[in-house]
From Swiss-Prot:
Principal place of residence: secreted
A GO term from the CC aspect: extracellular region
Protein's cellular compartments: Secreted
Keyword Cytoplasm: no
Chain segments carrying region Disordered: 1-21
Key word Secreted present: yes
Organism: Oncorhynchus mykiss (Rainbow trout)
Modified residues (Methionine amide): M21
Keywords: Amidation, Neuropeptide, Neurotransmitter, Secreted
Family, per entry: Belongs to the tachykinin family.
GO BP terms in the entry: chemical synaptic transmission; neuropeptide signaling pathway; regulation of heart rate; regulation of smooth muscle contraction
Protein name: Neuropeptide gamma
Function of the protein: Tachykinins are active peptides which excite neurons, evoke behavioral responses, and contract (directly or indirectly) many smooth muscles. Is a potent vasoconstrictor and secretagogue that plays a regulatory role in the central control of ventilation, in particular, the heart rate variability (HRV).
Lineage summary: Eukaryota, Metazoa, Chordata, Craniata, Vertebrata
Length: 21
């Protein structure tokens, strides 16, 4: 269940990058 939060963090970073574009 440690991979779940890790994926969310990665997704959040990608979302932030897309929002900046």
């Amino acid at each position: 269940s440690s991979a779940n939060p890790q994926i969310t963090r990665k997704r959040h970073k990608i979302n932030s990058f897309v929002g900046l574009m």
